[in-house]
Amino acid sequence: MSWQTYVDDHLCCEIDGQHLTSAAILGHDGSVWTESPNFPKFKPEEIAGIVKDFEEPGHLAPTGLFLGGTKYMVIQGEPGVVIRGKKGTGGITIKKTGMALILGIYDEPMTPGQCNLVVERLGDYLIDQGY
């Protein structure tokens, strides 16, 4: 199965009639393994900040999480495992695996819980597969 299939069929799939607005799977170094066509163009330092927050939980809390120039307020996650951010009616969930970052971005009417479910479920699966 190609990495694109994971984005198309597992991240951007329909959940209770809703979809993520965009999603990606990146390496810890910021390399793009696959992404949805409308995933924001990000800067390397934005990914570096995200990775640092996984290594040092709370690093992004004072400044916020930036991705593609968009600032998200960091909200409760799982230190070292999941980062969650909120912006207006939408937000972002990022799950860290041994080799990858799974990112899902949503907006209403999708709920934060639906985004968390989709992103974290795929992340757990990839961890089980050795990624």
UniProtKB/Swiss-Prot annotation:
Superkingdom of the organism of origin: Eukaryota
CDD domains the UniProt entry points to: PROF
A GO cellular component entry from the record: cytoskeleton
Coiled-coil regions listed: none
Classification via InterPro entries: PFN (IPR048278), PFN_euk (IPR005455), PFN_sf (IPR036140), Profilin_CS (IPR027310)
SUPFAM superfamilies: Profilin (actin-binding protein)
Sorted UniProt keywords: Actin-binding, Cytoplasm, Cytoskeleton
Gene3D superfamilies, per the entry: Dynein light chain 2a, cytoplasmic
Molecular-function GO term, any one: actin monomer binding
The UniProt record lists the keyword Hydrolase: no
Compartmental location: Cytoplasm, Cytoskeleton
PANTHER family (UniProt xref): PROFILIN, PROFILIN LP04
Similarity annotation: Belongs to the profilin family.
Quaternary organization: Occurs in many kinds of cells as a complex with monomeric actin in a 1:1 ratio.
Function: Binds to actin and affects the structure of the cytoskeleton. At high concentrations, profilin prevents the polymerization of actin, whereas it enhances it at low concentrations. By binding to PIP2, it inhibits the formation of IP3 and DG.
Protein name: Profilin-1
Provenance organism: Triticum aestivum (Wheat)
